[in-house]
Amino acid sequence: MVESESSSASIEIVVEGRKREVAEFAVRRSLPSIHRRSVGPFVFIDHFGPMAFPPGKTMDVLPHPHIGLSTVTYLFEGEIIHRDSIGSLQPIRPGDLNWMTAGRGIAHSERSTDEQHIKGGRSHGLQIWVGLPTAKEEVAPTFAHHPNATLPTLRHGDADLKVIAGEAYGVSSPAIVSSPIFYVDARLEKGSLELPNDHEERAAYVVEGSITVDGRTFDAGNLIVFRSGKQGILRGSANAHVMLIGGERLDGPRYMWWNFVSSRKERLEQAKREWKEGLFAKVVGDEREFVPLPDH
């Protein structure tokens, strides 16, 4: 459900995540939405879990391609093994950041660990895509991992914050990004937190608990997009967990199809052909399976 908030002082729109199925598990997808395609350069938000899976039933995302974007994986629970076509092999655990820039093309997989296959386990996290500026859409693919302990934390207002990527509240993440952004993990006690106001577009996604904005309460699964230039103040319930995102708008419209993002429609068609014809480099160490090109 998408609801306009034209009568609100600071809220532009609220997007309620739609349920989708990915790798046989339910996720909530907030972006893209029919009424809101992006927030700054953030073009995709999937929230998976919290969920438990039994032995033999794991959360495996098979090898698949990307172009024109950076994928950002961040966990609250569980563990995932990342592999890609440039040879990266990296476990990601709660609080870590995996930042993969697809550029002109990369394939990757994200799978449960061997122990989870045997014993079962839990999983909870976010998968986010950040569109690349036009001049950087065709850069060589890269991958970077930032352990939890390397990401800066601070206390601001009534919230404990971690700056995952970009810059916020006077603190910068070590992650290298392609445009001015902020991506912040906020744990808000009863009290308030003001959003950074130095970016063109800003939003707050409720992971757990609830927050109040302009006298209205929003539960988990809601993405609250704020009006540009307006003060955004969140008031939290006990143990509210919120992710803050924002940045400058992309330099022109973006076209999205499946896992591909580009400023040019013909580039999407090229990527489709290349994946269908097996021209993407294979995921190193995970060459036997792949996600086929969808029919539509």
Features from the language model and the residues they span:
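Jelly-roll (double-stranded beta-helix
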Residues: 1-296
